[in-house]
Amino acid sequence: IAAGGPPPPGLDDEEKRAFEHVSFFYKHGLGYAQEMGNRPQTLYALEDSPIGLAAWIVDHDIWTYKQIARVFDGAEEGLTKDDIVDNITLYWLTKTGVSSSRLYWENKNAFFAPKGVNIPVVVSAFPEEICPIPRKWAERAYPKLIYYQKHPEGAHFAAWEQPQAIVDDLRDGFRSLR
């Protein structure tokens, strides 16, 4: 995908759509992840300026921008302006704008290649996620997948936009382990 190659043979329609979505993200929306993965110290400015932090959060990739922009366009579903300000405030007051990028630095060589996950896994799939995960992909990536739920709406901020769906999936998914 990162090299811009064609989809592998044998993908079903859902997998083709997911592949196209991920390919688009790799070509047009991965800049912020590359910055955090390769040069995280350049982001220390986020600790110095609440406006800089807000700009980074609001406009650091295409899908984030889409999710946030619809708030300011008057969309009634999803996030609110207060949600956005609350999130920026949480990052600012806890000084986690930079430390949150450590995930990218520490996983820069294997971010999209989960290996060795030998614990029970629950997957909540949302249609507008940056990297959609068809059930077949989840099953291949996580041999101990115990629950998979595909939702009709939600995106990269699903836990923020659809918190009850996440709670329900976690409860339903891990109930069998009690």
Predicted segments — roles?
Residues 34-178:
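C-terminal subdomain of alpha/beta-hydrolase-fold enzymes, centered on the catalytic histidine
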